[in-house]
């Protein structure tokens, strides 16, 4: 089975805009088409509460014929056109779909951050983890989120093995970002967020990239758009993950990044597993 995850940073822009950045996103989408994955998880869709428009659906069906889609968008009183997730999956797959709420603080449960697909023998779940925010203003809420999310995955894992993916908004260890020393109190590399991810893994999950590749350095999934040279210089962060229940980690045959060319921000990640 092949699965892909990508924080797209606006599905609407990627599908309908003709800006230079959107064209780069469209090139990445063509790369994903060629990958012919069974399941594609997409984060930060930024769609309205009504979800994809008719035009969005038409373009998706043109790009990905033979795929169903399911989505969850941010709902009031949460911010409009914010966060949001989507799955594309091949039509021969017939998952049971759920949109879990985990008892998160503030409006986090209404921001469209988690979708779970249940199959006979396993779960596939994606997450767009809340950012701790400028000035770490959301860090306390983020810590609650991390604990609640870990509990949620552990509950799934009691039923059957889990494949979990998404933008976790944390570089777990120093090897997972280019400049750890200068980012100690940056969102995504605070001690608190790193401890939250350690706790998540400790509930019974494996970071599949490290499982496959060991301590290979300078491999990242995100490069800041604010710096024009972040990708050229590879000053990146690894904040997107494919996790599996420990008991199926040895079934993973590939866990890697997909090249997204000159496009900064997130790059897609791929998992291949014998299930």
Swiss-Prot record:
Record's cofactor remark: Probably binds two magnesium or manganese ions per subunit.
Entry keyword Magnesium: yes
UniProt-annotated location(s): Cytoplasm
CDD domains the UniProt entry points to: Ape1-like_AP-endo
Binding residues annotated for Mg(2+) 2, in chain numbering: 167, 169
Residues marked Important for catalytic activity (site): 240
Annotated site, Transition state stabilizer, chain positions: 169
Residues of the site described as Interaction with DNA substrate: 266
EC number: 3.1.11.2
Reactions catalysed according to its record: Exonucleolytic cleavage in the 3'- to 5'-direction to yield nucleoside 5'-phosphates
Coiled coil residues, start to end: none
Residues bound to Mg(2+) 1: 9, 44, 265
The protein's name: Exodeoxyribonuclease
């Amino acid at each position: 089975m092949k699965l892909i995850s990508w924080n797209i940073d606006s599905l609407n822009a990627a599908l309908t805009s003709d800006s230079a950045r959107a064209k780069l996103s469209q090139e990445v989408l063509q790369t994903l088409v060629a990958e012919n994955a069974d399941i594609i998880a997409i984060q930060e869709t930024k769609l309205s509460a009504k979800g994809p428009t008719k035009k969005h659906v038409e373009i998706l069906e043109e790009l990905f014929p033979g795929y169903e889609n399911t989505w969850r968008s941010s709902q009031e009183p949460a911010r409009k056109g914010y966060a949001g997730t989507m799955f594309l999956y091949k039509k021969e797959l017939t998952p049971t779909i759920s949109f879990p709420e985990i008892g998160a603080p503030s409006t986090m449960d209404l921001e469209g951050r988690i979708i779970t697909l249940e199959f006979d023998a396993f779960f596939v779940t994606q997450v767009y983890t809340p950012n701790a925010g400028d000035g770490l203003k959301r860090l306390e809420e983020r810590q609650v989120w991390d604990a609640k999310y870990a509990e949620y995955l552990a509950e799934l894992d009691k039923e059957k093995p889990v494949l979990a993916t998404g933008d976790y908004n944390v570089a777990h260890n120093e090897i997972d970002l280019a400049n750890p020393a200068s980012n100690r109190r940056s969102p995504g590399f605070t001690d608190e967020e790193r401890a939250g991810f350690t706790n998540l893994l400790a509930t019974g999950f494996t970071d599949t990239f490290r499982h496959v590749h060991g301590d290979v350095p300078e491999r990242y999934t995100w490069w800041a758009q604010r710096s024009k040279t972040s990708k050229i210089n590879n000053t990146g962060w690894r904040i997107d993950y494919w996790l599996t229940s420990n008991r199926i980690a040895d079934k993973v045959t590939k866990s890697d990044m997909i090249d997204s060319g000159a496009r900064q921000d997130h790059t897609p990640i791929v998992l291949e597993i014998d299930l």
